[in-house]
Amino acid sequence: MKIMITISENSEAKELMPIAQAVHILVNKLPVAMRSKNKPGVRLEKGEVVDTNYEGYVLKVAIEKGEVVRATPIIGPYAGLPVIVAPIKDGDNVLGAIGVVDITAGIFEDIVAISRRPELYKFLPEDAFPK
């Protein structure tokens, strides 16, 4: 049996759920939120769906800009916590966005600055090593 997951600008929470759940598991159940461009989405925490009508201000910003957004919201369930949100694109068309609470905010830069271990260069992108 073949199953296909399709995401569009108008996908609803239930259509986004399989991808959001997979990412949630991949990031060790950190809070994950996902929405389409035109409809509210889903929010997951601790392995559970906690919201199926999630608007997400930072998700909307990433959709509008069409680029990754790192921010610390001042309102909403993640107020005061750093988040990272990536747009979901089909070419130049932004279909939605997915984000995660970024518990790593700043620590990688600190670790790299402290260690400056050259053997790490082959595993990390260029911008991970500010010069």
UniProtKB/Swiss-Prot annotation:
Record lineage: Archaea, Methanobacteriati, Methanobacteriota, Methanomada group, Methanococci
Annotated TM spans: 68-88, 94-114
Name by which UniProt lists this protein: Uncharacterized protein MJ0405
Location in the cell: Cell membrane
One GO CC term, this protein: plasma membrane
Keywords per UniProt: Cell membrane, Membrane, Transmembrane, Transmembrane helix
Mode of membrane association: Multi-pass membrane protein
InterPro entries named in the record: UCP006557 (IPR012029)
Principal location class: membrane
Organism expressing this protein natively: Methanocaldococcus jannaschii (strain ATCC 43067 / DSM 2661 / JAL-1 / JCM 10045 / NBRC 100440)
